[in-house]
Structure formats: C-alpha cells, structure tokens
Amino acid sequence: MKKWFLLIFVSALIISCKSKTSTTAPDTVTNTATHPGWIMQGNIYEVNTRQYTKEGTFNAFAGHLDRLKEMGVQTIWFMPINPISKKDRKGSLGSYYAVADYTGINPEYGNLDDWKNLVKAIHDKGMKVLIDWVPNHTGADHPWLQTHPGFFIKDSTGQAATMFDWTDTRVLDFKNNEMQDSMIAAMKYWVTETGIDGYRVDVAWNVPGDFWKKCIPALKAAKSDLFFLAEGDKPYLMTSGFDAFYPWEMFHMMVKVAAGERPAFGLDSIKAKYDSVYPKEAIPMYFTSNHDENSWNKSDYGTFPGAAHAPFAVFTQTMGSSVPLVYSGQEEPLLRPLPFFEKDSIVFSKLERAAFYKTLQELRKNNEALSADAVFKKVKAGDEKSVYAYTREKGGKKILVILNLSKKEQPVSLTDQSLFGKANNVFKGQSETLNATAWKMEPWGYAVFSYNN
C-alpha cells in the first residue's frame, strides 16, 4: 500500500479513537525466525501482473520466465492475485490491495488452474514463488463485512473503519480470534493447494506480533521452508517470525545521498542502528524501487536518475545481511510511474540493464561471500563523503565492493593490505592486481572484486 510514513503513528491514534479494539502492535515479543536456506543467497523480483504484459494475465507473464531465469532471478513475488472489491473502488480497475476474496483469483489475471500452472512452471525452472498478502484490511465489499461484521474495527458511527485515504478498504480487528483463525486458514490454502513458497505481507507493521507468532508456525507446519517478508521495519516483526523487513530508513538515506543532501558515510549510521535494534539474523530487503516507490515517488528513474542508479543497485545487491529486490521493468529500464488504479503496460524491448542485474544476481547465487549471513566489513578506499567501500566474506570467499556515490570523479586507493593481490574484476571479467596505487573512479562508478575463486 501507499506509504504515508509520517502518518504511521497518527494512524494508530486514529484507530484507537475509533475503537477500543485497536490493532496497534505490541513491541515486546520473543520468538525468532529460522530462515529457509534457499533465501540466503537468493534475490527477489517483484511482478506487477496487471502491468507486466499487454494481456495482464498469468499466461502472458509465463512467456517471460525464461528471460527472468537467464537474468538470474531466483524468487518471484507477485503483487496480490486476489479479486479486487468493486465498492468504493479507486479508478476503473481498483487497488490491488483492496481484496474482495482471500481464496479467490482475480479473473483479470486468469483462473486457479492458470495460477497453479504458473507456479509449477516457475518451480520447474528452479525458482521460488511469493504472493502478496493483505491481512490488515479487506476490500470494501468483502463477504466478511456481511457474514462476520465482528471481524472489523468500528469507527465512531459503528461502521467498519478505514485508514488514511484507503477508502476502498475496511480494517480488520485482530482481537477477534475467529477472524485470526479464518485469516490463517486462507493463507494456508495458498500453501497447500498451490504450493507457494512464502508471503510478502502488506502493512505488516499494523498487525500485532502475537498474531504472527500464531500464524507463521501454523503455516510452517504445512511447509517448513516458507519465507516471510514484512512490509514494515518495526523491530517486533523480526522477533515474531518474519525473515525479512523493509529497511525504509536505509532507502531514504540512499535517496538523500543520491541527491547530494547527505554524505555517503550517512549510510553507516543506518547500518549501525539496524545492527543495534534488530536480531542479528534479521534480513533487510534492499531496493532502489518497488510498486509504491515507482507509482508514488518516481523511483528509480527520479530518485536514482541516469547513471546514479548503478552504484546504488550494486549496494542493494551486495550489502551485508540482506536480500535484494528488483521491481518489474527496472531491467528495461522503466522510466515512468505505473498508475495504481489503471492499465499501463510495461514494454520490454531494450533490456538495457538485464546484463548488469544478471552479473550481480549470479554472483550472489554462486559466491557465499554474498550470503545474507556473510561477514560485512567497512573499508576505506577514498574520501568517505563520496566513496563507500566494504567487504563481504564467508567460507574462504571474499568480495570487495567500491562505490562512487557522487556525481564527480573520485580518487580511489586501498590502504588495507589484506586486500592487496590478485582479484577478479567481476564486471570486467578479468584478473587485476590490487595494491596501494590510486586510480580514478568515474561519477557514479562502481567496482566489484572477487577473491579466492
């Protein structure tokens, strides 16, 4: 859903005023996730089915699977595949996140057999499948509003409440245990009946941790290696069973660095904060764009314009403790916002960034130094206001990343003698000798070196 970051706290107050059964999540929980092994060196590619092809169907999207496999994509996350409510609908097609039926398929995309065939095709190519889930609210004409009105938070007039400007939705009440059980049953359906590999959870930050401590183990009982990604960055999510979270503060710092508003070393303060407030096993999902940022905030073409995209994309693909995300069309690249409530197909023709992403994603899949649990170490390679450098290391493998996060050419030199010697320049595909000799890195430049291969 569209992020109104400054209003998150306000939203909790509004809902609290509307009902005594607030959905405000507790901050004190105890259990942690055991990550599925397949995500540790994996990556995520977000699919906007409506806009991905002219047809906007599962069957049409299937024609892109070979291309995505070739690009190194490992996990495909589909935005909500459920039917969209018609009541209070926004635009002609409505928001993907106004769900009318938790166990139904949006007929615009196809039918259940089409979906099952697509999941099988993805699995047959060795890739994983995530679907978007919207537990915080339903669409404005979801059947539960008639059959189970007690499932919903009420406003001051006794009607099912809404949040922010999401007038096409109605907020669910997580103090209702029957609703919780119904939600878990619906989520389990997609696991047991269609074989998905996990969930990206919308507005996870407004759902209580106690629910996730109940829900996630119940789903993992059906399939033990499920992956759970929370849209949110509240620490309680990472101690309630989620594997990964949205690192919004890091993303916003990246945008400021790209705009020249903050120095490159500003990224360090966010990394230090994450290290202090999250369990060490928590996985941030780094990105330069996603469906919200593209539609509402001009990412990545506006936030990381032109050549600025590349070093920040390298950052997202190689940063410590993380899993990277690529959004539909970034490989083209997509240089416009996709409307949220109307049809506007992506045209794939140039694929100018496909080889770039392939290099990064294949490196991550094949080199355990980029595993989510590999060691991260910041190193000095130049003026730290502009040059950001670090190593990743695990199992005798080492990766060195050097980024020029500025619009000016920067001198680069290494001082750490442990980095001297032969290394493979990943993007040039050649062996080089690294030493204390300085060189110039072009504006928005980047270099990735692999040792011990």
List PLM regions with ranges.
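Carbohydrate-interacting/catalytic domains
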Residues: 16-41, 45-48, 53-77, 83, ...
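Substrate-binding/active-site clefts of carbohydrate-active enzymes
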Residues: 20-22, 26-74, 80-194, 214-223
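Active-site clefts of carbohydrate-active enzymes
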Residues: 279-302
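Short, solvent-exposed turn/loop segments enriched in Gly/Ser/Thr/Pro and often Arg
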Residues: 77-91, 132-141, 202-208, 231-236, ...
